UniProtKB/Swiss-Prot annotation:
Name assigned to this protein: Type III pantothenate kinase
EC numbers: 2.7.1.33
General function of this protein: Catalyzes the phosphorylation of pantothenate (Pan), the first step in CoA biosynthesis.
Family according to the record: Belongs to the type III pantothenate kinase family.
GO BP terms, alphabetized: coenzyme A biosynthetic process
Places the protein is found: Cytoplasm
NCBIfam families linked: baf (TIGR00671), PRK13318.1-5 (NF009847), PRK13318.1-6 (NF009848), PRK13321.1 (NF009855)
HAMAP family reported for this sequence: Pantothen_kinase_3
Chain residues that bind K(+): D129
InterPro entries xref list: ATPase_NBD (IPR043129), Type_III_PanK (IPR004619)
Cofactor dependence: NH4(+); K(+)
Source species: Clostridium botulinum (strain Alaska E43 / Type E3)
């Protein structure tokens, strides 16, 4: 049984993989001041709720974009499972060629997604990860990670409008029926959601132009808001909610088995 840990800015996603299938996955809040004891309690409770024995965990791999939680997280994993986790970072075997000016700058989440997309789809891909930040990454058919771009996430954009404009309320992220709206809440939703969809479509268009090698890139979306955006645009070919966990599983096999 392999434990997969994806620590993002907002949530930590955990998955348990055994016998070529996922048997459980959970999402807990990322909190910078949480101790290793608190993380230990949470993960042991989650395992117990699913009738999983911690002693059956034979390997662990961690991807994190939150440096200030890593000390507590690693201590928790060592204490609960008695083994050293693989940490996604410089020196790890990926099977892709990172063409960034400084490969060490590429976030662990982007590497994990790129590895998964390359190994699973075997074609040029554009990966959009709708998280706290929205990242766009391009990978060629030969496994060259070309780079991409990073944008404020959808919730960050909406929250910034609420925080900086005194008379505008915080709104739910729901797609309105029309672009031309007749009340403040729907008008904000229209501007934020349709504006974001337009951003996605334009960035995908420009990335395809720059990647042009005769093969149309396949556009994959993942992350918590992927379905919301994908339902409103033809720019996204597929939503793969498990892309990051798949990437962690692949990286574990490359580096431990």
């Amino acid at each position: 049984m392999i434990l997969l840990v994806d620590a993002g800015n907002t949530n930590i996603v955990l998955g348990v993989y055994k016998d070529k299938k996922y048997i459980a996955s959970w999402r807990i809040s990322t909190e910078g001041n949480k101790t290793s004891d608190e993380y230990s309690i949470q993960i042991m409770q989650l395992l117990n709720l699913n009738n999983l024995n911690p002693e059956d965990v034979k390997g662990i791999i961690v991807s994190s974009v939150v440096p200030n939680i890593m000390h507590s997280l690693e201590n928790m994993l060592r204490r609960c499972f008695g083994q050293e986790p693989i940490i996604v970072g410089p020196g790890i075997k990926t099977g892709i060629n990172i063409k960034y000016d400084n490969p060490k700058e590429v976030g662990a989440d982007r590497i994990v997604n790129a590895v998964a997309a390359f190994e699973i789809y075997k074609r040029p891909v554009i990966i959009i990860d709708f998280g706290t930040a929205t990242t766009f990454c391009s990978v060629t058919e030969n496994g060259d990670y070309l780079g991409g771009c990073i944008c404020p996430g959808l919730r960050i954009s909406a929250d910034a409008l609420f925080e900086k404009a005194a008379k505008l309320p915080r709104v739910e992220l729901e797609v309105p029926r029309k672009v031309i709206c007749k009340n403040t809440v729907s008008s904000i939703q229209s501007g934020v959601l349709f504006g974001y969809i337009g951003q996605v479509e334009y960035i995908v268009k420009k990335m395809k132009e720059e990647m042009n090698d005769g093969i149309e890139p396949y556009v994959i979306a993942t992350g918590g808001l992927a379905n919301l955006i994908a339902n409103e645009t033809d720019a996204i070919d597929k939503v793969d909610s498990d892309l990051t966990l798949e990437g962690l599983k692949i990286l574990y096999k490359k580096n431990r088995e």
